[in-house]
């Protein structure tokens, strides 16, 4: 069957009625060709008439909010979904109009730091903007995104070619539409990975011809591998759909620029997917890569890079089953059962629909398809599936080694002895599906510790001699967390798997070496100046019962944390020796203990200062929110510390 879209050809962006000027050509759209001729479908952009304002990227980190421009604050309100000038579904049209380029620039700046790959940048944009708009407005938004992404990512396979980034972003939107648009089902064939790569390369070659340049075979090969990774990612993870948040929710903008400039403990120049793709798996190479990249490489028989700093003792223990370094066996994995009411209109995935030249005013992008049903590898039925007598379990071979967990769901009921003799490569043929996850930021727990079983448990799955454990793995930018539950033959075996997972997670996950929380001028209820002044006032005026009524209290949320930072940076490379990492975790755990103690000591002062104030409940909510957050971090680092401590006693 011939593809409905065998060529993706860039066409010039020309305003209707304007004369063509070759010096101002740019790639702004794609004309879609079929094997049997033209489909007469295209997206036509409009040439932006507003020149970019140089010097607009000056560091404004320390400027007061009163010095920021009106365009900035307008962009902030749009970013937070609180701009009432137009319906939030029209935000893209609003930002993309020619006379609002300054606002668009500020809006894209609020997305900083942009992820290290173009698909991540596009996903971050679509998670903050309802991406339905007219063609020319979408085109301007993508062009601005391309320019700002290029300015901070200079060492990629795209070089300094802004138009290439623009082309690829548009191509990704078309691919997302093709893969996840319900209207295509049963009518037209879907893009294959090969078709997507060929069409995009065709558009890039045309752009090179227009610029009298040449796209080398070596560069094409690199780009093809990057595009293949993008395809695999989009195939399973549609672009997110922005939905308007509650106006009472905290604004996440006021500190984004601070987080970008002050997170000195980590480099903002992480390796790109391209650099990870070219990494050779040997002892001297070390990089962290996305889960999608790992899966794509594993499914295409490419070597996986080393994720950690390999030391002499690693050579002794890696591959020895039953140790912190390696756990390998056949377990039961809980399958995901989707609730009938799980999906809602707010969970629609992003799709793109290309309209014909005859209807240029129609909407370019429509969000039509609901998210695909997760596989058993995405999340389990519940964190305590073993208590549910209706839970379904599948046999799977699980291997944990060198910072990764390999999961092979078995086709047949093979004997354990036979499976243990199989290599990871031979296991592929024996599996109905398989997946590999990096254990970066992962956390495993034995479930029995957190479950109180009644006197007469009804579940047939509760067996005293069996163990159950869960593993939670953050999936990176704008994505979900994977939560899996496994069942072992014994509780001791469950503990062994948990220790191995947490051991590798502790080795891979960096520890903040700078400020754990950035100092903020916002008042959350425990500002030392406010509390001192209030205490002084009460001491000098003991009969005064007037509460605080004129304060500006913000909602607290983590300004800088591992979770937030890793959502911004898809790939973070780290090289730390095991003993040094253990020391870092100990120091960080002690710091968290001090923060928790100080936070507890603050509560009586806050109660006294804010008693009777209309802000009392808000500041107490802030206190509780921060307390729970600090405890969560403390529990996690304590688990990491315990695993590394036990391992250090062996080496």
Swiss-Prot record:
Subcellular location: Cytoplasm; Cell membrane; Bud neck; Bud tip
Chain intervals with Acidic residues compositional bias: 39-65
Disulfide-bonded cysteines: none
Domain PH residues, every copy: 362-508
SUPFAM superfamilies, A to Z: Sec7 domain
One Gene Ontology term, aspect cellular component: plasma membrane
BP GO annotations: actin cortical patch localization; positive regulation of phosphatidylinositol biosynthetic process; protein localization; regulation of ARF protein signal transduction
Pfam families: PH_GEF_YEL1, Sec7
The keyword Heme belongs to this UniProt entry's keyword annotation: no
Membrane disposition: Peripheral membrane protein
Superkingdom of origin: Eukaryota
Region annotated Disordered, chain positions: 1-26, 38-69
GO molecular function ontology, one term from the record: guanyl-nucleotide exchange factor activity
Comp. bias regions, Basic and acidic residues: 13-26
Keywords for the protein's UniProt record, in alphabetical order: Cell membrane, Cytoplasm, Guanine-nucleotide releasing factor, Membrane
UniProt keyword annotation of Membrane present: yes
Physiological role: Guanine nucleotide exchange factor for ARF3 required for localization of ARF3 to the bud neck and tip and involved in actin patch polarization.
Family note: Belongs to the YEL1 family.
Official protein name in the record: Guanine-nucleotide exchange factor YEL1
Organism: Vanderwaltozyma polyspora (strain ATCC 22028 / DSM 70294 / BCRC 21397 / CBS 2163 / NBRC 10782 / NRRL Y-8283 / UCD 57-17)
Gene: YEL1
């Amino acid at each position: 069957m011939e593809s409905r879209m065998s060529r993706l050809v860039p066409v010039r962006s020309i305003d209707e009625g304007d004369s063509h000027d070759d010096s101002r050509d740019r790639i702004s759209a794609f004309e879609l060709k079929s094997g049997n001729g033209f489909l007469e479908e295209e997206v036509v952009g409009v040439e932006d008439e507003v020149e970019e304002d140089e010097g607009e990227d000056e560091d404004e980190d320390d400027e007061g909010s009163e010095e920021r421009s009106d365009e900035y604050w307008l962009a902030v309100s749009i970013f937070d979904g609180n701009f009432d000038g137009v319906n939030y579904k029209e935000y893209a049209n609003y930002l993309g109009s020619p006379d609002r380029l300054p606002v668009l620039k500020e809006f894209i700046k609020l997305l900083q730091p942009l992820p290290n790959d173009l698909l991540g940048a596009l996903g971050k944009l679509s998670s903050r903007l309802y991406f339905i708009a007219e063609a020319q407005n979408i085109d301007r938004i993508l062009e601005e995104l391309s320019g700002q992404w290029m300015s901070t990512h200079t060492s990629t396979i795209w070089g300094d070619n802004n138009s290439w980034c623009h082309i690829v972003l548009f191509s990704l939107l078309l691919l997302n539409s093709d893969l996840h648009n319900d209207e295509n089902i049963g009518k037209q064939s879907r893009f294959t990975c090969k078709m997507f790569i060929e069409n995009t390369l065709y558009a890039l070659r045309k752009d090179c011809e227009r610029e009298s340049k040449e796209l080398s075979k070596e560069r094409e090969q690199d780009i093809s591998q990057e595009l293949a990774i993008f395809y695999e990612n989009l195939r399973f993870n549609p672009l997110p759909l922005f939905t308007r948040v509650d106006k009472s929710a905290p604004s996440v903008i006021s500190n984004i620029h601070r987080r970008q400039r002050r997170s000195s403990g980590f480099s903002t120049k992480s390796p790109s997917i391209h650099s990870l793709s070219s990494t050779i798996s040997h002892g001297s190479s070390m990089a962290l890569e996305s889960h999608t990249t790992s899966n794509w490489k594993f499914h295409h028989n490419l070597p996986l890079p080393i994720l950690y700093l390999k030391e002499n003792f690693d050579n002794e223990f890696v591959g020895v089953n039953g140790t912190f370094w390696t756990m390998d066996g056949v377990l039961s994995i809980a399958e995901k059962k989707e609730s009938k009411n799980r999906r809602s209109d707010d969970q629609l995935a992003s799709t793109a629909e290309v309209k014909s030249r005859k209807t240029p005013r129609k909407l370019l992008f429509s969000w039509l398809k609901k998210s695909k049903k997760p596989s058993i590898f995405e999340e389990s039925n519940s964190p305590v599936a073993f208590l549910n007598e209706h839970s379904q379990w599948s046999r799977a071979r699980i291997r944990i080694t060198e910072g990764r967990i390999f999961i092979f769901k078995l086709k047949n009921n093979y004997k354990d002895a036979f499976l243990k003799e199989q290599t990871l490569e031979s296991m592929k043929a024996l599996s109905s599906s398989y997946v590999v996850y990096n254990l970066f930021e992962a956390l495993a727990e034995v479930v029995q510790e957190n479950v109180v079983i009644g006197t007469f448990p009804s579940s047939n799955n509760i067996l005293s001699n069996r163990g159950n454990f869960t593993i939670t793995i953050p999936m990176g930018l704008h994505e979900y967390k994977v939560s899996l539950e496994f069942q072992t033959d014994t509780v001791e075996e469950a503990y062994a798997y948990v220790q191995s997972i947490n051991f590798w997670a502790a080795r891979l996950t960096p520890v903040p070496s700078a400020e754990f929380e950035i100092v903020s001028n916002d008042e959350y209820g425990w500002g030392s100046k406010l509390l001192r002044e209030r205490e002084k006032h009460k001491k000098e005026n003991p009969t005064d019962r007037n509460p605080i009524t004129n304060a500006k209290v913000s909602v607290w949320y983590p300004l800088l944390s591992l979770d937030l930072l890793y959502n911004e940076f898809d790939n973070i490379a780290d090289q730390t020796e095991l003993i040094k990492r253990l020391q870092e975790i100990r120091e960080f755990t002690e710091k968290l203990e001090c923060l928790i103690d100080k936070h507890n000591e603050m509560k009586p002062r806050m109660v006294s200062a804010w008693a009777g104030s209309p802000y009392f409940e808000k500041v107490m909510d802030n206190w509780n929110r921060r307390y729970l957050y600090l405890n969560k971090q403390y529990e996690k680092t304590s688990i990491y510390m315990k695993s590394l401590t036990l391992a250090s006693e062996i080496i």
